[in-house]
């Protein structure tokens, strides 16, 4: 990947983070922390890798994306808006009565959403079904799902992992957001799921652990997924919750609340400065 390509993606990621802040500020609630830390991987999937078309969001041979950690919907909505599925201005309607941008993704209301999610563990199960369906139909469809490291405390995730390996779902890419924080504290103190890499390998997954904010590593891992033809892939994304906004970074306090007016102003000032720096670097 060239530096110019990485700069373009970084700008998309910055816009995604701005959208997260806009939405959660307008709603006065939501989950900004775990939304901010997946901006890089979402920008790569939606602007480089996935076979999708905003003009035809339901085309049968499209790749599928399932946000299993459905509470991070602000990041998905901001990504879809950035990609052209709906107007960016609509992000300010997050969680409003009558809005098609509810607190958790709704496939029946929101253009570009492939699966309704929210109940932790169910999204990865649905992704397995999509991947198996594509295999049975012999369609060249890849299925991506992002789940949280707190989410893997749910037993349903491990049932899904067992299912994926049994059916050799090589078209399934599980992306595990490893930020080490969940609503009640660190994952290590609430319910330690480590060592995740070894456990997933024991479930017969192709497992890669990368820096979830590094585009070169993201691209290499996704290419390794495409090269795998016998087993499902799990990419463990080492991330920092709240990345991009100083006072939200690595803070459990920002798992589930929206910024007030003062906090919004600070966050947007920081993100605008970050975008301006990228623009300057691009000259």
Region roles according to the model:
Residues 77-79, 106, 156-158, 184-188, ...:
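Short acidic, glycine/serine/threonine-rich loops at helix termini
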Residues 20-23, 35-166:
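Cofactor-binding active-site loop characterized by glycine-rich and histidine/acidic residues
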